[in-house]
């Protein structure tokens, strides 16, 4: 199991990926402790001095003007968690819950939240013991933070709700006991600190980014394979073309294609007396389209990495000045906007792949047998596989509709503009699955196309990509049950079978 020392505010993208993919043993770096304790001392001083501060000794939202008596402060925080745990939908899987929990720990441990070290350590203990709170997927609008999902997370700390331990759903109290843990009682400010934040939105979008990176790399490899299958030109990837435009994403994608499409292969040699002048856009413009997608991936990485290390609580405790200040760091608009842009990129990656599949089906464009199979008529070949790809590409066009432009007022109009970041991030998962299915069909089709170029082979890297598939999926000599082959190729893509052939591009 991976062991990680958490220095608050310094998580890397590779660490976040590892947390999502694998269970982790966390340890909080000792450098964080003084800041955590100072923020708690500041909260305690406010209570002791009888000062009024939002979230410490007041109600919440529209009830912020209601002063809460000192003897009710602990009950205030518990009631907040219970009342806000109002999510609906299927439970998030363990990987997503783990990522949300670590993001929450990372934010709280920055020392601006007024939450005791013991509560942060209780969250760390949940992660280390593999106790995963039941968090419904839906119910947050991404401002004031992800209240419902984080309330469900926090229920387990109190011994309320349900949690999964060793694959079994249990009452939280039972799960804690089996893991050797105890519930905690929350002090002033702590319930609000746990609930306020963009951690669910950020985790949702991070998963979308991780999947988009795999899809991008796989699509570049399959795009290169298709270029070979239809004997497309290498000339559009010439570095001079892309340097003249100056778009960095485009320049870098063209470099990836040159890495994959070497000049020393049988297919490359076949171009020496080629009569073609220009290829269709789905081949020729791959650097331009995929370069624009890469730019969106990089922008998403920048914003999400900042948000993963951010303090998105409210109010914030500035212990050095003895102040508690209300603001709006809980508003997940940055996450929503990059998730929307990432959705466009995922949709375009899939759309371009589908067009290349369609190109291979057309004997006039590809100079290959219709639908990539001999004895057409008796055999239908890839005819309906392309239809499946078209259906998935069409679904993604609807799913790519932006969420950040939508807003519904909540909390009696106190919270009158919200981000819809959770929905913006969550739909990326379905889009990624759709695009992976499209790329799987292209991989199958491109390898079939190269097979049909009898005697011609591609570059070493692309032959490796073809061999990886052929070890699991045979060449099509006649029609057979097609769906298992798509499923197999899809599973290989999800395992990173093609991603490892592409140098780091982020």
Curated annotation (Swiss-Prot):
Modified residues (2,3-didehydroalanine (Ser)): 144
GO cellular component: cytoplasm
Keyword tags: Cytoplasm, Histidine metabolism, Lyase
Major subcellular site: cytoplasm
Reactions the enzyme catalyzes: L-histidine = trans-urocanate + NH4(+)
SUPFAM superfamilies linked: L-aspartase-like (SSF48557)
Molecular function as annotated in GO: histidine ammonia-lyase activity
Gene3D superfamilies attached to this UniProt entry: Fumarase/aspartase (Central domain) (1.20.200.10), Fumarase/aspartase (N-terminal domain) (1.10.275.10)
GO BP of this protein: L-histidine catabolic process to glutamate and formamide; L-histidine catabolic process to glutamate and formate
Lineage top rank: taxon: Bacteria
Compartments it resides in: Cytoplasm
Pfam family, one: Lyase_aromatic
PTM summary: Contains an active site 4-methylidene-imidazol-5-one (MIO), which is formed autocatalytically by cyclization and dehydration of residues Ala-Ser-Gly.
Transmembrane annotation, as ranges: none
EC number: 4.3.1.3
Keyword Lyase: yes
Known pathway: Amino-acid degradation; L-histidine degradation into L-glutamate; N-formimidoyl-L-glutamate from L-histidine: step 1/3
InterPro entries the record matches: Aromatic_Lyase (IPR001106), Fumarase/histidase_N (IPR024083), HutH (IPR005921), L-Aspartase-like (IPR008948), Phe/His_NH3-lyase_AS (IPR022313)
Cross-link (5-imidazolinone (Ala-Gly)): 143-145
NCBIfam families found in the cross-reference section: hutH, PRK09367.1
Family the UniProt entry places it in: Belongs to the PAL/histidase family.
HAMAP family for this protein: His_ammonia_lyase
Protein name, entry field: Histidine ammonia-lyase
Source species: Salmonella paratyphi B (strain ATCC BAA-1250 / SPB7)
Classification of source organism: Bacteria, Pseudomonadati, Pseudomonadota, Gammaproteobacteria, Enterobacterales
């Amino acid at each position: 199991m991976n062991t990680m020392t958490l220095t608050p505010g310094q998580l890397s993208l590779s660490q976040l990926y590892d947390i999502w993919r694998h269970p982790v043993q966390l340890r909080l770096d000792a450098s964080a402790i003084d800041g955590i304790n100072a923020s708690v001392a500041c909260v305690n001083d406010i209570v002791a001095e009888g000062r009024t501060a939002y979230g410490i000794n007041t109600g919440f939202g529209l009830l912020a003007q209601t002063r809460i008596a000192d003897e009710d402060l602990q009950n205030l925080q518990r009631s907040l968690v219970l009342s806000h745990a109002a999510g609906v939908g299927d439970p998030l899987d363990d990987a997503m819950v783990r990522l949300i929990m670590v993001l929450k720990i990372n934010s709280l441990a920055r020392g601006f939240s007024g939450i005791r070290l013991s509560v942060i350590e209780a969250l760390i203990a949940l992660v280390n013991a593999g106790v995963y709170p039941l968090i419904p997927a839906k119910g947050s609008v991404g401002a004031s933070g992800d209240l419902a999902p984080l309330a469900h997370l926090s229920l387990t700390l109190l011994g309320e709700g349900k949690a999964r331990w060793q694959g079994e759903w249990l009452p939280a109290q039972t799960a804690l006991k089996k893991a050797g843990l105890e519930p905690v009682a929350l002090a002033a400010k702590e319930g609000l600190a746990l609930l306020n934040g963009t951690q669910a939105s950020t985790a949702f979008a991070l998963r979308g980014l991780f999947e988009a990176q795999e899809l991008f790399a796989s699509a570049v490899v399959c795009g290169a394979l298709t270029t070979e299958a239809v004997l497309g030109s290498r000339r559009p990837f010439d570095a001079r073309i892309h340097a003249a435009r100056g778009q960095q994403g485009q320049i870098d994608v063209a470099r990836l294609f040159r890495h994959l499409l070497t000049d020393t292969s049988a297919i490359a040699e076949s171009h020496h007396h080629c009569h073609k002048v220009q290829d269709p856009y789905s081949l020729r413009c791959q650097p331009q389209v995929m370069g624009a997608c890469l730019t969106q991936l990089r922008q998403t990485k920048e914003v999400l990495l900042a948000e993963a290390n951010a303090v998105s609580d409210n109010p914030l405790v500035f212990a050095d000045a003895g102040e508690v200040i209300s603001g709006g760091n809980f508003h997940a608009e940055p996450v929503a906007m990059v998730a929307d842009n990432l959705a466009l990129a995922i949709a375009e990656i899939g759309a371009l792949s589908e067009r290349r599949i369609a190109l291979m089906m057309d004997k006039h464009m590809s100079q290959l047998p219709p639908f990539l199979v001999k004895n057409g008529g008796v055999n239908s070949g890839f005819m309906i596989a392309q239809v499946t790809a078209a259906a998935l590409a069409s679904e993604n066009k609807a799913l790519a509709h932006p969420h950040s432009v939508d807003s519904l007022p909540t909390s009696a109009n106190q919270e009158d503009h919200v981000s819809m970041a959770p929905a913006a991030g969550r739909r990326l998962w379905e889009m990624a699955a759709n695009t992976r299915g499209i790329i799987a069909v292209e991989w199958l089709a491109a390898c079939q196309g190269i097979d049909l170029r009898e005697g011609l082979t591609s570059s070493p890297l692309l032959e490796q990509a073809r061999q990886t598939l052929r070890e699991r999926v045979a060449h099509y000599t006649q029609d057979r049950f097609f769906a298992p082959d798509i499923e197999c190729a899809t599973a290989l893509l999800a395992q990173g079978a093609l991603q490892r052939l592409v140098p780091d591009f982020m």
